[in-house]
Amino acid sequence: MRFVSAGALAACLWAVVVAAPQNPPPPPPPPVPTVTPTATVTPLPAVTTPTVTPTPAATPDPTPTVSFDDWLTAVRAEAVTRGIKEATLDLAFTGLTPDPVIIARDRTQPELTQSLDDYVTARLNPKTLARAAEVARTDKDVIERVRATYGIPGPIMVAIWGLESNFGQFTGVRPVITALATLAYDGRRPALFRSELFQALAIVDKGLVNLPEFNGSWAGAIGQPQFMPSSFLKYAVDFDGDGKIDIWTSPADVLGSMANYLKTAGWTEGARWGREVKISKTVMAKIEKAVPMRSTGCRARREMTQARPVSEWRDLGVLEMDGTKLPAASLSASLVRGQKRNFLVYQNYQAIIEYNCSNAYAVSVGLIADKIARETPAK
């Protein structure tokens, strides 16, 4: 959800990506945070390892048991024990109040309120695909340098870039500290967002951004890759070698940081993410009896089946989209089901899920990347 501005036309083409369809167009991008040169960034101890846009299972709308002021007092005390300076906390917490708009957005994420089929259809329209292909051609040199370093295909990086921030057109206008404090206090995922709040405070405390300019998404995601603060501290890189990590305005740092994340998440160079498959009602009934769903992990992981060799899916009657048989391969694959569309997904798909735990999102990334690869083949 962040990137180098490509003009009003790109914003129009990708508007559906950066907001739910019923919302009005996003406001103009906020001032770009000032990034201070840094060689090595060490994150504070984290409670969890979140995805870029966290979507773990949530409890049903719990009510906070203490006042926000009392809660913030406790958070401040813990922040001090984590090494955050009092002066930073004074700046960050003075006048801080929860934002009800952020709570509303958390309840209406398109990945959660739209079906997989509808979400994918909305993103894979001709205009968005054309824009992605254009970016793949325009930025091919830096994309190739990043690919050579990390082994992540250019089309995958471009697809994520577009879905996250419309190639930098919209990186968020919500104050990050306010967003994270609101979500941590809300109580649906307190450990996750409390941890991210401390990481965000560390970013400010280290002087990596100026607090008045530290804006992001409603979930506290920052920069063109829409990294959560902990991900910024762990995975963001100075790929252009100018002495600072800048995921707000440097395409090289943006792409390098995304690629570093995916490589760390287990992306295997040269392997596919998955494929769309054809499944009849009779075959689906057999699958439901023979292949259990996963029972652990974030919501997206629990919405896919356990892994089976492609050869086993072949034996169950799963077909290629043209009606031919699947290869008799030992490659491990899980089934992701939509209302009408179905996908066998491989290990590289799991790396995309690590970036954003939503099957609708991950399938969209894969399909957009496939389209880009067909239109801009490697030389």
Show which residues each predicted segment covers.
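Bacterial N-terminal signal peptides
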Residues: 6-16
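Compositionally biased, proline/threonine/alanine/serine-rich low-complexity intrinsically disordered stretches
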Residues: 14, 18-73, 77, 86-90, ...
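Export/targeting segments at the very N-terminus of extracytoplasmic proteins
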Residues: 69-89, 127-163, 173, 182-193
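Short, functionally critical alpha-helical segments immediately adjacent to catalytic or ligand/cofactor-binding
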Residues: 79, 88-98, 151-168, 200-205, ...
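Signal peptide-directed extracytoplasmic domains
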Residues: 92-145
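Substrate-binding/active-site groove segments that recognize
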Residues: 177-184, 197, 222-237, 258
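Acidic, glycine-anchored loop motifs typical of Ca2+
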Residues: 239-247
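C-terminal soluble interaction/assembly domains
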Residues: 280-379
